[in-house]
Amino acid sequence: MTYLSKKVFLYALLGLFSAAAWGQTADGGNEGARTVVVGVDHSPPYRILDAGRQSGLYLDIFNEVADRLGWQVEYEQVPFRRILLLMQEGKVDVMLGPVRTENRAAYMAYATAAFPPERRLFFYREPENRVTQYSDLYGKSIGVLEGARYFERFDKDDQLKKSTAPRYQNLMLMLEKGRVEVVVAPELAGISAARDVQVEVEVSPFSVPGERSWIAISRKSPILEYADEIAEVVEAIRQEGLMERLVTKYSNLAVK
């Protein structure tokens, strides 16, 4: 599921080199434009890939970046954990929205913290599973997204009972069926997932502040050299107010 001026341009020398490497015209026109492969999973409202739609906060932002840099974008839809593997192998160029971790930095470069932070919420159905403090998590079965990172203490806590699923929608269905007692998710992703599968949930009073998430580039990708240009365009989008408008748009959609 998809947060300066407009005079952002590629350095001439890089543009000429890229034309040879990618078969693109030096002026960055549509003829022979480079194609950037982006690994994505369906996770509204950030990345929406459903019934032929390709939208969402993260996708809309990256599409704007690609358009300004003269790139074509090809989205490859796979589960979140699979995207991480494809980034390691260099089989996709870009990943949208990972949080920064030391392990991931070995195989992906973090171009820019493009997307706003979101609280980590703890969803539940039965009153006894309400989380008021971190210690309430012990002894409960907790649903988490495969390959996701939430916050350091939680991620490294081997005493917690965690069950995984490839999508937040799956986790909400597991919650409904009693297979897990709590689901942890970024705020908008969790709310959207519960609504999408029509599962009634409650939100615990305990939450954890989120981190900004990133546009990341595989270290094996030829577009790694354009990390600075991506960051410049994202800053332009932010300065122009487009980022804020997109965040507001998708935040409103998520909570309707």
What are these regions (language model features)?
Residues 11-20:
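Bacterial N-terminal signal peptides
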